[in-house]
Swiss-Prot record:
Promotes transcriptional elongation by Su(Tpl)/ELL. Essential for development. Its main location: nucleus. Residues 437-454 have a biased composition (Basic residues). The gene is Eaf. Keywords: Activator, Developmental protein, Nucleus, Phosphoprotein, Transcription, Transcription regulation. One of its GO terms (biological process) is positive regulation of DNA-templated transcription. It is found in: Nucleus. Residues 139-156, 307-319, 344-373, 414-424, 455-464, 475-488 have a biased composition (Low complexity). This is Ell-associated factor Eaf.
Amino acid sequence: MMMTKQKSTLTERLNIGGDEVRELKLGATFNPKNTSTAFHTIKYDFKPASVDTSRMATVDVGSNNQVTVTVPNLESSGVPQTVYKGNHKKYTKECLIIFDKETGAITLERLNHNIQVKKTRSEVTNKPSLMSATNAPMSNGAPVPSSAAAGTGSAGKLENSTMRISSKTKVSTGSRRNNIIDFKPRNSPMQQSSPSRPVASHRSPQSAPAWHANNAQQTLPSIPMIMDDDDFGLSAALHNGSQANISGSSTGSSAGQPDYASVHSGKQRQATPQGHAKRQQLTQRSSPPMQQQQHQNYGRGSNNYAQQQQQQQQQQLQQRASFSHSNHSNSMPMDMDSPTHNEQTAQSMAQAAAALEQQIGGELSASSSSSESDSSDSDSGSDSDDSTEDDRPNHHTNQQLPPAQQPQHHHMQHQQQQHMHQLPNLELGSVSPAYNSHHHHQQQQQSHHHHHHQQQQQQQHQQSGIYASNGGFPNDLLQNDLQLSSNSSDDDDD
């Protein structure tokens, strides 16, 4: 079936009809003495449409089996010719059948060389399309140039297209190279900036902490400077002698703001020792509403209160001694820091207490009521136990006074009782807040005059044994003395 198709196809193509047998002739190429006839095949990688088939193509064979084929192109294509280059190889067993239409003879020829060419400007790998090019002898040379021309024409047309494409590719490659060149400078600054960026990153943390440090140095001092300004304002108000500002600073310090106002007020009070007693009395008289704030302050500073309880008792005794002495003598305000004045006030307080106890003991012994006698005995017994050896000579001298001096001594005792009756006007609750407001000042004074306070403590233990031996609060002792004085005053009235 396939053979019949091929035969029919061949007969149709060669215009050979019938089933007749035809003779096959061998060509001159089979003759070993032939040197003039040779058949070659040229294979092109493509066949351009712009090849001019009416003109002849040229084949040049150079050294090292190099072959150059030049094919003319049409004038309308714009490209004069297309050039192919390649190499040739010898055939060994390939043959070619040549059919002559005029005579009807069929000739078998041997192929000599196989030439494979490709377009010079294109560097594409050679992919030749098998193409049988018949090279007839000199007499049949017409078909060879025609076939060659056809092949070369196709090659020429391909050259035109490839030249256009190559020109375009040149432009494209040039643009790509330009882009690459453009990319390199773009990348080069990026590469240059990449090392610079880490440097900037290394610098940025260094600059950032410096900036924060500068801000910290700017902001941190600003807050205490503002507070210092306020404190200087408070100290200036205290220096001018404004009693309202003094009480306000004491209330502010007792309400939980003892940081700066108390410190500066303490310094100001140290600077002005003459008006210390008057201002202290005024703050004590105007400070009964401060008891609630004083309780709050005790709740806040309960830890420090247990450690400083004994010092508070001794300093309150000094304040009370100064108050009683100032009310008794109506003299100028005194400085609590002077050691001589403390000794005098302690001695006078001890003498007054001794005289008062003597009088109370004498009057209570003369009373007839059993209840009053029992209470007087218990009070006198406790007071006699608490008294020191320094007070006993005073009792002895007071008991041995001559009769001529009894009225004068009785008059002095009566004045002392009147002054002791005036003590409740000081309001016992106001003593502790006043001390609380000056608590920080006295702590600073204690730090500077620690040795001086030790001497005062020894003197207090020696001279006022009543308060030193008793470990309780001074307010209870003061109330006990006031009760005794009130009982004695009732006896005098009777």
